[in-house]
Amino acid sequence: MSKLMLIGTNYWYPSKFGCTIFRKVRFQSTLKCTSTARTQPIDPSAKTIRHLQFVKEIPFETGIDIQEKFVRAHLDIKQLQSKIKREMTNLQKEHNAEIQLNFHEQMILDNINQMKPNPIVLTFQFEPTYTGGKRVKKQITDEQIARYEGFIPSKQKYNKKPKFVQAERGGQVTFHGPGQIVAYIILDLKTFQNLPAKCLVSTIDNAAMNALKVVPKFQGSDEPLNLITQKTNDTGVWVSNQEKIASIGIHVRRSVTSHGICINVDPDLSYMNSFTMCGLSEKKATSIREQVPDSSTSVNDVAVAFVNQLAKLLGITTVERIQLDDLPIYTD
């Protein structure tokens, strides 16, 4: 039995619909997203959020593969449900009457509806990796990539060299590595009330800010970190106008989200501050350790606090959590 089966059978659906089509979507909304704004689930599947917490460092590409499997599960079920809805509509038009299902047909439809995955948050700590967002996809040169992959801080000379990987998220170049939590948020925006993409981004920011207040300052302690952060005109979460502690970038396909946020707990900041990150040449990265040197809070502590705060802001009352070292990925 794979580890994935431990989570629940409604998490995994092999793809039967071929390749997923990536669509460029521009989200426009007049809905104002504020720090006090709240949404709530409007579909039963969204009332529980599941947190898969990876507690060991893994390659960035492995994390992306794991994320894509869960995104495809959402997309495949949406496609199946849409197909059933179209067929039912066509039958009603053909017979000019409402279609009455027998017991077994209704049971099949009910089972399909219950297969819809819950919102899921994957939290990782990656091996050193520079990732490019969509804004640099056609601009970055081989020479620039070589500089990223050739940069080895003096304290990291015996550790793995960084890689450069192009990612399907918004934004420009950022860094993921040890000492940093990366949280990928996979959910269907349409299963929540008034939650366009821009409001999800605001919700993620607010969850990170709240987590940095309430996460334990010391492992096993009830004393909160109480690190005060803010938003600025630039994306992400900031300790000051010049010091960024969390970066955000999401991707949306047919209302299903992926990617999310990274929060600096105790990374080697020279990976970030030796280059221009997120296109902000005059800004610098900071971390919990730099801001609160005596804190012993860990990446895993911050991961738990972030997911709990995200659930609150989404109006979700149940968080199911499982800790994993790795998750086998099987291809068709």
UniProtKB/Swiss-Prot annotation:
Its main location: mitochondrion. It holds the Pfam family LplA-B_cat. Keywords: Acyltransferase, Mitochondrion, Transferase, Transit peptide. Residues 115-318 form the BPL/LPL catalytic domain. CDD domains: LipB. Substrate binds at R169, G170, G171, Q172, V173, T174, F175, H176, S247, I248, G249. Its EC number is 2.3.1.181. PROSITE patterns: BPL_LPL_CATALYTIC (PS51733), LIPB (PS01313). InterPro entries: aa-tRNA-synth_II/BPL/LPL, BPL_LPL_catalytic, Octanoyltransferase, Octanoyltransferase_CS. It is found in: Mitochondrion. Belongs to the LipB family. In the reaction, the free carboxyl group of octanoic acid is attached via an amide linkage to the epsilon-amino group of a specific lysine residue of lipoyl domains of lipoate-dependent enzymes. Catalyzes the transfer of endogenously produced octanoic acid from octanoyl-acyl-carrier-protein onto the lipoyl domains of lipoate-dependent enzymes. Lipoyl-ACP can also act as a substrate although octanoyl-ACP is likely to be the physiological substrate. This is Octanoyltransferase, mitochondrial. The gene is LIPB.
